[in-house]
Amino acid sequence: MIGVFDSGLGGLTVLEALVRRFPDQSFVYLGDHANVPYGDRPSEEIVDLTRAGVEHLFNAGCRLVLLGCNTATAMATRRLQQSWLPNEPRWAGRNVLGIVAPTVEAATRTPWAVTTPQYPQNMNDDLIFVFATTRTIDSRVYAEEINKRCPKVRLVEVACKGLVDAIEGGDAAAAGRIIEGVCRDALAAAGGERPDRVILGCTHYPIVADRFRAHLPEGVRIFSQPETVADSLDDYLKRHPDYAGRNDAPAVVQVLTTGDPMRVTAAGRRFWSEVPAFAAT
């Protein structure tokens, strides 16, 4: 069984992609809606909340947990992998993965574990736009990881303030205005140059990807995290089959929330129309 943890609803876009890609795999999703949003919280609190969510999923029987949230990934993944799990014997054989790594791998076409800069020759001075939340942009996780692999790539990062709230609130008009503004800002920062690729660095953004596409030059490749994460997990499970678990029982998809299940279910169906009803933790 594989777990997916998010501070709210955005991770449902990842869960939907995973369920489509792995129809024989069981998943448990946990949304920490009692504490959303994470972006305004201190870093240590984000780490603590993420660790608590991961523990809950481990206790539910998950051996592998994906953090379906860029803020949690940026703030907590390395701490959990390097400092927490190695010192918790009860969680031996379990692992936590973030969603920044597969996104950067796909956008730069380089493996995550690099010690020296590596990049295809035709990417030497490519222009990449990154759209994400303010907290993710401020963490510099995308800038640092992309520049480590492709130091000559030109990067334009734009924080999409208020977009997550507009999406979760179902305010399409507000979301459209924000997206139009951030795309205009990115193109202005690039001097009007067409980007070679665009990263949507928030799991809420795939459901408004068409809005981004409408305000960017035609044909620009947009990296949306759900499919990228599904591709990466497919590769990971081939290399680490023990985390896939047994497939001799019917696959189950369970969704949990620390908030109000009825309210979260209604809101969640804007992200994934077929999401099961949420249950309280």
Predicted regions: what they are:
Residues M1-T281:
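Non-catalytic structural scaffold of enzyme domains
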